[in-house]
Amino acid sequence: MVNFFGIRHLSPAGAYHLYHFLEEKKPKIVLIEGPSDLNEQMQYFMHPETKPPIAILSYTKQSPIKTILYPYAEYSPEYQAIRWCKENKTICRFIDLPSKVFLAFSEKREKQEQKEEQWNVYEQLDKQSGEDGHETFWERTLEHTQDALAYQQGTEVFGKNLRELEQQREEDYAETLVREAFMCRKIADVIKEGFKEEEIVVVTGAYHVEGLKCWKEVSMTDTQ
């Protein structure tokens, strides 16, 4: 069975628990939610002269210029996963849609937001949690837990709740399904390369764990 570890980006607890999870599992390959066309940039993360925080900037060349910034701190789970792979001479890859696709998504989203106020799934979660906000909810229930298993299980539940809410927003959820189908395809490709399921760890936002666990059924085809 493929090992999945759901995170929250820029979560110190996630970075800590993930590093120790990798120490326990000793995978032969680690797949990370991140633009797959930026894999060449990963080599610079652990360069002796590179000191976090760092970021990768993707941009268009035609006016109006569109940009997307991918930030990483030392306490980013993704950064710690890359660090572990470097230390243990383990293959590490980003598996999400290429950044140029996200740039196209952002342009489409901007046009949509001009027509209507953006629906915020986190506001809906805040109402359900009874907290001052989802940040407070996360801090209280997950960020301070010292139990790695409790963190992992808690993030999955948190992600499932987000998915249930976003399904009410069909256009946003459709984008999610495309991303997950692409990432599922990347997982399937790794299996075809000869890796066993138990040798793989997939690091992704907690929101996507449930969608990616169905990788055998929903992976993207060549035509798609």
Predicted regions and their residues:
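Compositional signal for N-terminal targeting/processing segments
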Residues: 1-224
